[in-house]
Design a protein with these regions (language model features):
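Solvent-exposed residues in well-ordered beta-strands and their adjoining turns
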Residues: 28, 54, 74-78, 138-140, ...
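Short acidic, glycine/proline-rich loop/turn micro-motifs
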Residues: 37, 85-86, 238-241
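Structural motif
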Residues: 23-24, 47-51, 71-72, 204-205, ...
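Conserved small/polar residues in nucleotide/adenosyl-binding loops
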Residues: 3-7, 244-250
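Short gly/pro/ser/thr-enriched loop/turn and capping motifs at secondary-structure boundaries
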Residues: 57-60, 81, 234-236
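Metal-dependent amide/peptide-bond hydrolase catalytic core
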Residues: 92-242, 246
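Alpha-helical metal-binding/catalytic segments enriched in His/Glu/Asp
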Residues: 1-29, 71-75, 81, 86-105, ...
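Acidic/histidine-rich catalytic neighborhood of metal-dependent amide-processing enzymes
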Residues: 1-66, 108, 112, 116-122, ...
Length: 250
């Protein structure tokens, strides 16, 4: 999508017959390392509104994303010779397994869709002596998101009640918020994008993002920024994009 944007910029710069207002273009490479568009100088960028080009299938148009948080949980065990362990050993690996088993199986990425949120354990390193788990928390709804964070806190308290204070240490951090509230006052951005897609022969499909986008961070920093499709598929896996989607007339 970056090369397509660059090519379009070249056309606009070289073909003076195409009338247009002021256009700003920025490439933000830091999303996948967790910084998003934090380093983008919005004042220097000089635009009132923007779009990210970070979506999926052709026609997708998005202005809602997950509220997101990350829970890092460290389990402290007690290692001792297994032949002399009765009443003494605390196996951090088994305690970590017990903690994970408290979470609802139906609220995982593989079993949710649309506006359904989830818990996703994406890291576990464990020995008898210690364990580290990382769980990401996602939900579009602010109240459900808050309830999910409280669930994680409760699960860790239950572990400490069972195995002693300090067994489970939780660090819970918010990552980003749903930009919906920042886009609703500027719905002309959505209507204009719909019309542009229709003019190009593309059927617009407004869907919630089951993830995040730099546009969420930018919207909360004062630059309302919905998300446009790239025509790509299977992100974070074996990516694919249709050649015909790259060559649509604009």
């Amino acid at each position: 999508s970056e090369m397509c944007i660059r090519d379009r910029c070249e056309i606009l710069l070289c073909d003076k017959s195409i009338e247009h207002g002021e256009i700003g273009v920025a490439f933000t490479p830091d999303e996948e390392i967790g910084h998003g568009a934090a380093l983008l100088d919005i004042e220097g960028f000089g635009c009132k509104y923007a779009y990210t080009v970070d979506g999926g299938a052709l026609g997708e148009l998005e202005y809602e994303n997950f509220n997101a948080a990350q829970a890092e949980i460290r389990i402290k065990g007690v290692s001792i010779h297994p032949g002399d362990a009765k009443g003494k050993m605390k196996n951090a690996l088994l305690i970590a397994n017990e903690l994970v088993s408290k979470f609802p199986v139906e609220q995982t990425p593989a079993k949710t869709e649309g506006y359904e949120g989830f818990f996703h354990f994406d890291e576990l390193n464990a020995t008898v002596e210690s364990a580290k788990l990382v769980c990401i928390i996602r939900d579009h709804d602010a109240e459900k998101f808050s309830a999910k964070k409280q669930f994680v806190q409760k699960a860790c308290r239950e572990i400490n009640d069972a195995y002693g204070d300090g067994t489970a240490e939780l660090v819970l951090k918010d990552s980003y918020r749903n930009m919906r509230e920042k886009i609703l006052p500027h719905m002309h951005l959505i209507e204009n994008a719909k019309k542009s897609m229709e003019n190009a022969g593309v059927k617009p499909v407004v869907v919630p993002i089951r993830g995040g986008t730099d546009g969420a961070q930018l919207s909360f920093r004062g630059l309302p920024c919905p998300n446009l499709c790239t025509g790509g598929h299977n992100f974070h896996g074996l990516k694919a994009v249709s050649y015909t989607h790259l060559t649509l007339p604009t």
